[in-house]
């Protein structure tokens, strides 16, 4: 018996509906561990400054009975600062794209704005960690952790065989921060160094965070119990590598850092000039480092296993 036309699949393909899921999958990393863990402070100019002070070294203060007063000069503060940096993104959505029926979202404008917000936050996190200088001019840039932490900076010599992050070195930097008066409570490390820290021989001191809500927000967290206090160890996706594939492990007193905000996040619809709409999302910010002595860095650590 011959097959009828309506029973022949090849003859009715133009009438078949497409099967396109309304679920959009995007696994691009968006966690901003450093920025999410520091406080915020308003700033009032494109160059914000603050004062850093220190006490004299502790010593025996006994004086002779009836001793004549011997005044000393007062403490002189050190003035430091950072330029603000403008971060902005734009997206154009045509009136037609906004009007048509779309898979996975109702409004293209709302969907693209959500993506821009995540991208902007990632860009800010990257700069807050990796920027090494503060620059003026029309295109200003804010110095990040890489540029601020200079004193408790224990670096391997790039190109030598001594490139493995060790527990002794890790604790040496924690001790240096504590000796200077800091109380480091946070470690930022890339995935490779995070695994190295978890594998320290004293790993009985490593405790996995079981706070489900906290892990949901900021991903992997461990607690390392050092001789100078308990420190949270975070895996950061945005610690940049140099040309030799070396990276930095940051040991931070997070209370000494703040996100300085000159212009908060703004989402604006720009004036229409045609058959579409341009969305502008922007913010202006800087990193405030109250006292870099409270934190430390282990630089030039190999971020891949030796071959």
Regions found by a protein language model. Give the residues of each.
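Flexible, glycine/threonine- and acidic-rich loop/arm segments that mediate assembly and lattice contacts
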Residues: 1-307
